[in-house]
């Protein structure tokens, strides 16, 4: 009977400690994905600006 109580206590401690470490790991992964999204957004904004300038130059060259 005492073994069951000890086992439950140890399992509870392990679950709490693993739960905290998993949250940290998921947070790091989420931040990496967020950073990739920010870089993609910034790159697309730059490309749109360059394409708009090229369209303006082409329109000016046509007259």
Swiss-Prot record:
Domain of life: Eukaryota
Organism: Drosophila melanogaster
Cellular compartments annotated: Secreted
One Pfam family matching this protein: Cecropin
Effect of residue 10 to L: In strain: B141, M2, M40 and MJ2
Protein known as: Cecropin-B
Family the entry assigns: Belongs to the cecropin family.
Keyword vocabulary terms for this entry: Amidation, Antibiotic, Antimicrobial, Immunity, Innate immunity, Secreted, Signal
Arginine amide PTM sites in chain numbering: 62
Main location: secreted
Induction note: Induced as part of the humoral response to a bacterial invasion. Transcripts appear within one hour after injection of bacteria into the hemocoel, reach a maximum after 2-6 hours and have almost disappeared after 24 hours. Similar response is seen when flies ingest bacteria present in their food.
Gene Ontology biological process terms in this record: antibacterial humoral response; defense response to Gram-negative bacterium; defense response to Gram-positive bacterium; defense response to insect; defense response to virus; humoral immune response; innate immune response; response to Gram-negative bacterium
Annotated GO CC locations: extracellular region; extracellular space
Role according to the record: Cecropins have lytic and antibacterial activity against several Gram-positive and Gram-negative bacteria.
PANTHER family documented for this protein: CECROPIN-A1-RELATED
InterPro entries cross-referenced by the UniProt entry: Cecropin, Cecropin_insect
Tissue expression as described in the entry: Strongly expressed in larval, pupal and adult fat body and hemocytes after injection of bacteria. Maximal expression is seen in pupae.
Position of the signal peptide: 1-23
């Amino acid at each position: 009977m005492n073994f069951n109580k000890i086992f439950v206590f140890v399992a509870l401690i392990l679950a709490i400690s693993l739960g905290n470490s998993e949250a940290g790991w998921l947070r790091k992964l989420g931040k990496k994905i967020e950073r990739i999204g920010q870089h993609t957004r910034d790159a697309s904004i730059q490309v749109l600006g360059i394409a708009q300038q090229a369209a303006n130059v082409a329109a000016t060259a046509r007259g």
